[in-house]
């Protein structure tokens, strides 16, 4: 063993040695010979396309979350096999923030949720107050500190979970796509807070994230996974160069400055941020004797952007004709909607009125807590306004039966896809939505076969062929969204 290897082992807070894992009834391994060391105080970013094994790997780093299946290999935390650590010790030293915020909330008040973990670990009231105040300040929770958890938006719930975990000051903090339900401003603020905690407290961070432009500048190292294996490990510039060399599709997810750098021959270091990219561009342009403003004019003309745009147009043309044909008839409308969660609380939706035409694609935008999810729940009759009404096909939505409304008119995809799942496998879940398939004769049998064809068709469209026997809760966040 080399001196460098000895040094790495000495400084490693986490070691994963030849880890393999397969879910029950699955021939293909979700993790295949994964080996990795994480240094104490390191900021490690784990990335890869949906279903590559990121979430599965992270769940193995805390035994209460580890899925059932066939497993071999070794995981050491500070030199101790992670399976030999008690749940209490893991709770205190290894923080874990899940993708789904509702899976971690256990109390009904925001302030109590912040304090719950510390109370469970036996901290004194004075320490609890200090740490709760610290986290509330970090995350800007002061304005909703005394609110009921049920009143929070998905983004606010995730912020609360993050603050609750960080209040325990763990040695290692694992975050599985923590900003997936935050708006861009809140996500940026949160990631800055994570960087600050890593710098000030020396907490080791293992983060999976799709907003790579936000996290790459803070990352000490990046791990790229593909098909259950580690594809490459290195600093952000090294990862960019390696993915470009392999012509791997993950290169398209790299920060824009890295993608621009890859198109130009240069001896300068690879830029990560826009600021670094501007400096690099100035140096390159000076050497070539051209203006930065005109540096890529010829490149824009020569690149295959127009070809790609043309191909995209061809692909979407048939969908445009079928689904977005301009029509004047209004399919959904709301008139002067008002809603609040309690008589004593302020209104969340205030005098909202708008209409939606058939075939129209309508985007409802806004920051966390602005009433987006509440509005959608009113439009789908999941909540009832205390004033105003919703019209569907010109008819008051309250006059539709549940079966008629949700079978013939509305499909609702919730923020949390797990709220739809009721079966033990992906395949059973899909058949449940069409009423199941039973072999019968004549017309009933034909109806059952039509349902089977419908399910098989949607399986191909959403690329779920290899996941049919998997439990819905064992899927990654992206796979759960596709199933939902």
Can you say where each PLM-predicted feature lies in the sequence?
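Conserved ABC ATPase signature
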Residues: 148-152, 156, 471-475, 479
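Conserved beta-strand-loop-alpha-helix hinge in the C-terminal portion
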Residues: 225, 229-268
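Conserved ABC transporter NBD signature motif
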Residues: 70-81, 90, 388-398, 406-407
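Helix-to-loop junction immediately C-terminal to a conserved catalytic motif
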Residues: 62, 380
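Conserved ABC ATPase "signature" region
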Residues: 126-144, 334-337, 431, 446-467
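Catalytic Walker B motif of ABC-type/P-loop ATPase nucleotide-binding domains
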Residues: 173-176, 182
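A short, flexible loop at the N-terminus of ABC-type nucleotide-binding domains that lies
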Residues: 6-16, 21-33, 65-68, 86, ...
């Amino acid at each position: 063993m080399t001196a460098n290897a000895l040094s790495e082992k000495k400084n490693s807070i986490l070691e994963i040695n030849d880890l393999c894992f397969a879910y029950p009834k699955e021939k293909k391994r979700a993790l295949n010979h994964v080996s990795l060391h994480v240094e104490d105080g390191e900021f490690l970013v784990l990335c890869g396309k949906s279903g590559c094994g990121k979430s599965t790997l992270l769940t193995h780093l805390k035994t209460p979350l580890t899925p059932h299946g066939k497993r071999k290999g070794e995981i050491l935390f500070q030199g101790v096999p992670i399976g030999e650590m008690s749940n209490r010790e893991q709770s205190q030293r290894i923080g874990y923030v899940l993708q789904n915020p509702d899976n971690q909330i256990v109390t009904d008040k925001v302030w109590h949720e912040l304090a719950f973990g510390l109370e469970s670990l036996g901290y004194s009231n004075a320490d609890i107050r200090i740490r709760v105040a610290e986290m509330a300040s970090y995350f800007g929770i002061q304005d909703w500190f005394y609110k009921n958890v049920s009143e929070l938006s998905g983004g606010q719930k995730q912020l609360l979970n993050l603050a609750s975990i960080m209040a325990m000051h763990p040695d290692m903090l694992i975050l599985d796509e923590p900003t997936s339900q935050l708006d861009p401003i809140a996500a940026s603020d949160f990631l800055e807070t994570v960087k600050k905690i890593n710098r000030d407290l020396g907490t080791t961070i293992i983060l999976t994230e799709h907003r790579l432009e936000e996290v790459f500048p803070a990352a000490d190292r990046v791990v790229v996974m593909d098909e259950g294996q580690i594809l490459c490990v290195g600093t952000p510039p090294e990862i960019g160069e390696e993915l470009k060399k392999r012509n791997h599709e993950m290169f398209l997810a790299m920060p824009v400055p890295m993608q621009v750098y890859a198109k130009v021959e240069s001896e300068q270091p690879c830029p990560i941020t826009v600021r670094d990219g501007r400096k690099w561009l100035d140096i390159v342009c000076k050497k070539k004797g051209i203006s930065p403003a005109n540096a890529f004019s010829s490149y824009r003309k020569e690149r295959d952007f127009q070809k790609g745009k043309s191909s995209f147009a061809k692909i979407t043309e048939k969908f445009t004709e079928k689904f977005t044909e301009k029509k004047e008839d209004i399919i959904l409308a709301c008139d002067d909607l008002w809603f609040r969660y309690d008589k004593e609380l302020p209104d969340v939706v205030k005098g909202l009125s708008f209409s939606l035409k058939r075939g129209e694609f309508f985007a409802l935008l806004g920051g966390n807590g602005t009433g987006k999810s509440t509005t959608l729940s009113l439009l789908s009759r999941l909540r009832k306004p205390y004033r105003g009404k919703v019209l569907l096909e010109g008819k008051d939505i309250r006059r539709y039966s549940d079966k008629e409304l949700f079978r013939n008119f509305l499909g609702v995809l919730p923020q949390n896809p797990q709220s739809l799942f009721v079966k033990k496998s992906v395949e059973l879940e899909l058949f449940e939505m069409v009423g199941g398939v039973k072999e019968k004769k004549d017309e009933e049998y034909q109806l059952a076969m039509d349902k089977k064809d419908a399910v098989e068709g949607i399986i191909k469209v959403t690329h779920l062929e290899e996941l049919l026997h998997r439990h819905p809760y064992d899927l990654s966040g992206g796979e759960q969204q596709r199933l939902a």
